[in-house]
Regions:
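Class I SAM-dependent transferase core
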Residues: 6-76, 81, 111-114, 118-128
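Short strand-turn motif at the edge of the Rossmann-like AdoMet-binding core
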Residues: 151, 176-178, 188-193
Length: 229
C-alpha cells in the first residue's frame, strides 16, 4: 500500500502518463501519483535529478522510463538488472508497470540508493532489490535483461551487461509491433547522434525512435537501443 501524500499538481502531471497508458490498477495509479512529491522532497535534500526537471518529472523521467514498457512486454518472473539506476530510473517506473517482474537496481553511489530504497518502501513496491555495487562487480547472478538510462557509452554497458545475461528465452514486443520476439539482452535509453558510439561498441543494436511512440518535443532524438545476448 502506498502511504505517501499525493499533491494536486502530481495528479495533474499524471495526465501525460495516462495519455499513453490506461490499464492501471488503483495501486499502480497511487504509486505513480506518489512519486512526484517524494522525489520533490528528497531532491531538496540530495541532488537526485536536475532541480529544473522536478516540475516535469512525469515526462522527462517517468514517461521516458516507460518508453521501454511501450516497446517490450516482460512476462511475470522475468529478472531485470538496472545498471547505474541513479535515482531509480528506469527501474522504479518499470517495477510499478510490471509488478510481476523482479528488478535489481545497482549503483556505485550509496546516497542515491538510499533515496531509491526509501521511495520503494514508501510506495509499497515489493519487486525491487537494491545493491550498492558497480555493475561490473556483480557476481553469481544472472538476469534476463539489463536496462539503463544515460549511464555510460554503449561499449561499456555491453561489456558490463553481457556476462550477467541468461541464455535466450523469448519475450514479445509490445504495442508497436505485436508479433516479433526478443531474446534476453541489453535495453538502454540514449539520445543524440549515436552513430560513432554504436560503431565503437562492436554491437549491432536495434534502434527504436521514442518520438514514434511519444511525439512530445522532449523525445526528439531520443532512442531505445536493444542489443540481444
Amino acid at each position: 500500500m502506498c502511504h505517501s501524500r499525493v499533491l494536486p499538481y502530481a495528479i495533474g502531471q499524471m495526465e501525460i502518463i495516462l495519455k499513453y497508458f490506461t490499464e492501471f490498477t488503483d495501486q499502480q495509479l497511487n504509486q505513480f501519483k506518489a512519486l512526484e512529491p517524494l522525489y520533490r522532497e528528497w531532491n531538496s535534500k540530495i541532488n537526485i535529478i536536475s532541480r529544473k526537471d522536478v516540475d516535469s518529472l512525469y515526462e522527462k523521467h517517468i514517461l521516458h522510463s516507460l518508453s521501454i514498457a511501450a516497446a517490450f512486454e516482460f512476462v511475470d518472473g522475468t529478472e531485470i538488472i538496472d545498471i547505474g539506476t541513479g535515482g531509480g530510473f528506469p527501474g522504479i517506473p518499470l517495477a510499478i508497470f510490471f509488478p510481476g517482474v523482479n528488478f535489481h537496481l545497482v549503483d556505485s553511489i550509496a546516497k542515491k540508493l538510499k533515496v531509491v530504497e526509501a521511495i520503494t518502501k514508501d510506495i509499497g513496491l515489493k519487486n525491487i532489490t537494491v545493491q550498492h555495487i558497480r555493475a561490473e562487480e556483480v557476481k553469481n547472478r544472472k538476469f534476463d535483461f539489463a536496462v539503463s538510462r544515460a549511464v555510460a557509452p554503449l561499449k561499456d554497458l555491453w561489456k558490463w551487461a553481457k556476462p550477467l545475461l541468461e541464455n535466450p528465452i523469448p519475450i514479445t514486443i509490445g504495442t508497436q509491433k505485436p508479433n516479433p520476439q526478443f531474446s534476453p539482452g541489453l535495453i538502454c535509453l540514449k539520445g543524440g547522434d549515436l552513430a560513432q558510439e554504436i560503431s565503437e561498441s562492436g554491437t549491432r543494436p536495434r534502434v527504436m525512435e521514442i518520438s514514434e511512440i511519444f511525439p512530445e518535443e522532449f523525445f526528439r532524438e531520443k532512442y531505445i537501443l536493444y542489443v540481444p545476448r
